[in-house]
């Protein structure tokens, strides 16, 4: 993936303001609520029976933070995203058997969460850069499936 200087600035500038715990928890919770079939990968998380149960679930919050923390590695390694996610791709493919489409869904939800948190600061140019990033991460995570 080729990044312009402007795209890199838009991504890193916004990332510096992201509350990883809050946005990560919200993104994963939204994934589980909006796309309930994704819950089958999280059966060990306990009660996911309703939106309020998912939103209040400490395991969802903790894993959401973990997911977005690892996403931060993409921000730090924009020029080497494939290698950054090689091990996670292997884990999600070989051991967890996660449908790679779920990576794309989570990326799209992250865009919604960022737009909600940053409002007018999440300009169309910023959104375009972040959309490119979430696609690159989803592609890197799906790499072991090909």
From Swiss-Prot:
GO cellular component, one term: hemoglobin complex
Domain of life: Eukaryota
Transport recorded as keyword: yes
PROSITE patterns reported in the protein's UniProt record: GLOBIN
GO annotation (BP), single: hydrogen peroxide catabolic process
Keyword terms, alphabetized: Heme, Iron, Metal-binding, Oxygen transport, Transport
Tissue localization of expression: Red blood cells.
A single GO molecular function term of this UniProt record: haptoglobin binding
Pfam family of the protein (one): Globin
UniProt KW Membrane keyword: no
Domain Globin: residue ranges: 2-146
InterPro entries: Globin, Globin-like_sf, Globin/Proto, Hemoglobin_b, Hemoglobin_oxygen_transport
Residues that coordinate or bind heme b: 63, 92
Annotated function: Involved in oxygen transport from the lung to the various peripheral tissues.
Family: Belongs to the globin family.
Record's subunit section: Heterotetramer of two alpha chains and two beta chains.
Protein name per its UniProtKB record: Hemoglobin subunit beta
Gene: HBB
């Amino acid at each position: 993936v080729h990044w312009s200087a402007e795209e890199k600035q838009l991504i890193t500038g916004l990332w510096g303001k992201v509350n990883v715990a809050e946005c990560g928890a919200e993104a994963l919770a939204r994934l589980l609520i909006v796309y309930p079939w994704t819950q089958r990968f999280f059966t060990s998380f306990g009660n996911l029976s309703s939106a309020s149960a998912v939103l209040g679930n400490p395991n969802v919050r903790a894993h959401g933070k973990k997911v977005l923390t690892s996403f931060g590695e993409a921000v730090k390694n924009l020029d080497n995203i494939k290698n950054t996610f090689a091990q996670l791709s292997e884990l999600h493919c070989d051991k967890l058997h996660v449908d790679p489409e779920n990576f794309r869904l989570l990326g799209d939800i992250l865009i919604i969460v960022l737009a909600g948190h940053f409002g007018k600061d999440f300009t169309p140019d910023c959104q375009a850069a972040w959309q490119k990033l979430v696609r690159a991460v989803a592609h890197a995570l799906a790499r072991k499936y090909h």
